[in-house]
Amino acid sequence: MGIEQKAGDMGIVTASLEQLVNWSRSSAMWPLLFGLACCAIEMMGAQGANYDLSRFGMEINRASPRQADLMIVAGRVSRKMAPVVRRLYDQMADPKWVIAMGDCAACGGVFNNYAIVQGVDEIVPVDVYVAGCPPRPEALIDGIIHLHEKVKRMRLDGELREPVRLS
């Protein structure tokens, strides 16, 4: 009989250190917003009173990558902007996660030319893709929930990054 059964309904919570750390990481993500096109407008809408991202622990958007652990890339990335995205990603502290918001961030969208990166995953590893042109705030929130679930499944020594595709 384990401690969980012995404690019963005494108000004692048992958890591993790994579960506690992952709960903290998923409950207090600090986003660095990288809005490059029309998806940024929907990203701003997700932070309004109707959707309230603060209930997911994202009250404050970080202006410095050194204070952020989540980068949300919203919109198309040009070849000239690619080194900036990479530099900001490299300046973020580990562990760090990336959400590619919108079709342009995921695959270049309708801009199939030499000046546009065909997916931000060519520059940085992406954890969650949020589809849409532009995706609604509900889709971004769904992507954030998927990322929280992924973070809660991580080991303390890390895991292989597998992107989650949303329909």
Swiss-Prot record:
Coiled coil: none annotated. It is a peripheral membrane protein. Its main location: membrane. SUPFAM superfamilies: HydA/Nqo6-like. Pfam families: Oxidored_q6 (PF01058). Keywords: 4Fe-4S, Cell membrane, Iron, Iron-sulfur, Membrane, Metal-binding, NAD, Quinone, Translocase, Transport, Ubiquinone. The keyword Chloroplast does not apply. It catalyses: a quinone + NADH + 5 H(+)(in) = a quinol + NAD(+) + 4 H(+)(out). It is found in: Cell membrane. GO terms for cellular component: plasma membrane; respiratory chain complex I. Signal peptide: none annotated. InterPro entries: NADH_UbQ_OxRdtase-like_20kDa (IPR006137), NADH_UQ_OxRdtase_20Kd_su (IPR006138). Belongs to the complex I 20 kDa subunit family. This is NADH-quinone oxidoreductase subunit B 2. It comes from Roseiflexus sp. (strain RS-1).
